[in-house]
C-alpha cells in the first residue's frame, strides 16, 4: 500500500517510512493513497475470528511491505499476551446499550491496544535496520504511560515524554515517572497539552534536527496507531447481537484519533451508522461537527485531562476528505487554524460531516452524574 501526505498528494511513501516518520516533512499527516474496502463476504468471514486473528487480517492489508505475515502474527500475539483479557477487549451490556472495555492492558488505558503493538514494531524495525531511534511524545497523561510501558527497556530506542506540569492525574504521573529504565526520559512542561504537542510538532518540522536525532513519534497522528485501533470497531461490531437497528459508536475523544479509527473502519466497509464524538467542556470538535466552527479557545482543566485539548491534530485527515482530497485546500485550512485560530466549515462540507458524525458536549456536572448513573445500573 502506498501512502501520501494530506499536504502533498504527489509524493508517495511506504509503510516503513510512514511508521518511523510519524509526521510528514511538510507537516501533513499520512493517509493511504487509496483504501482497500473489504467485501461483505470478507467482513462476514471475520465474524468468528479471535481478536488477535482479526487484527492480523486487518493490519496486514496496510503494512505488507514492512514485514511478512508470519512476523506480524508473532508480533500481534506477543503484544496482546500482556493483556488481562484473553480477547484484549470486552463488550458488556449496560441497560439497552453496549460498552466496550478497553482498559485491560498494562497501564489501564485504551491506548495500550495500539501502543503495545507499536513498541514491538519498533523492536522489529531496529533489529533489522541496526539503527537507533529517539521517540518524542506529548501527553496529557495516558498516552505517556502507555508509550513508556511499550518502549521501556527496548534496545536502540529512547523515549522522551512531554507532559503538562500539574495537569496529569496522580496515577498517570506515577506511571510515567517512577520507572528506572535508562531509555525513558520525562519532561514536565509549564503549560497545557497543546503546548506540549506544539513543541513536538516544531521538533518534527525542524528537518535538520529531527533527521539528526532519528526522531519518531507515537502520538495518535502516527498512522500505525489508527490502524491498530480500527480493529476493535470490527471486533465489537461482531459482538453486538441486536443489529436490527443501525449501529452507532459513541467515542470520547480529544485529539480525534480514536474516533477517526472508527471512521477508517467504516470506510473499509464496516456498516457503522453514526460515529458520535463525545467531548467535555473543551468542545472544539463538538462546535466543528454541530455548527461548522472549528475555533480554538482557551483550554479548560477538567477531571478528564486526556480530553483537555483545543487543537485536535487528527482532524486534518477529515479536512482532507471534506475538501475532496485537495492538498492545497487542506494547507489553506491548516494555515487558517494556525494563523487565525479558526477554520469555518461551509454548509456543504458540514452536511458531508454529518453523514458520518454527530457530536455532544458535557459539563463536569453532567459527566459525574452520568458516571454515577451508569455505575448504579
Model-derived features: positions:
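PLP-dependent amino-acid enzyme catalytic core
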Residues: 1-377
